[in-house]
């Protein structure tokens, strides 16, 4: 039987394996040389680790937004300009059960997992179009998939609707056909919308 050479393991494949492990054991910021068993603080709960994972993704988004601002002069745009790019990005609404008023855990978890799954096509677009550190986008894409799997474990009836392949191909073709200005605006809007969605998700996880 042929053995697998370590030289065939790509950085992305390594990241995928590492992030899948995070689904059951999240990394948490502890002082060098300490772990959860040696730290004087209390052990982190599953909810705490979920929050840390969301914050990890938010950190990646912040880094990408800063990179766009510093390297491509694409900083915070006005809402009016962003609104011109009428993407159907997932958003939180009162009916989704994620707000403190009218909170419903099962409904909220369904919204978060479905919304993050819908964001995958836009992250795929970023992976192809972003003119910067693509490894950060790949890591963020994998991390959101891991987060979906984690949250599905908390659901009574874990079902996530996936985008239709034909509709997905059509949307990607439409996004890729845009001019350079619209591509940059779309990239910024996707990052900002995912950031907003995760911020709402983080608040919801805190009251679960």
UniProtKB/Swiss-Prot annotation:
Keyword field contains Cell membrane? no
Keyword Disulfide bond applies: yes
Q: Which residues form the signal peptide?
A: 1-27
Which GO biological process annotations does it have?
A: acute-phase response; glucose homeostasis; hepatocyte proliferation; interleukin-6-mediated signaling pathway; liver regeneration; positive regulation of cell population proliferation; positive regulation of multicellular organismal process; positive regulation of receptor signaling pathway via JAK-STAT
GO cellular component, alphabetical, reads:
extracellular space; interleukin-6 receptor complex
- GO molecular function terms noted in the UniProt entry: cytokine activity; growth factor activity; interleukin-6 receptor binding
Q: Which residues are glycosylated?
A: 71, 184
**Task performed by this protein:** Cytokine with a wide variety of biological functions in immunity, tissue regeneration, and metabolism. Binds to IL6R, then the complex associates to the signaling subunit IL6ST/gp130 to trigger the intracellular IL6-signaling pathway. The interaction with the membrane-bound IL6R and IL6ST stimulates 'classic signaling', whereas the binding of IL6 and soluble IL6R to IL6ST stimulates 'trans-signaling'. Alternatively, 'cluster signaling' occurs when membrane-bound IL6:IL6R complexes on transmitter cells activate IL6ST receptors on neighboring receiver cells.
Q: What is this protein called?
A: Interleukin-6
What taxonomic ancestry is recorded? Answer: Eukaryota, Metazoa, Chordata, Craniata, Vertebrata
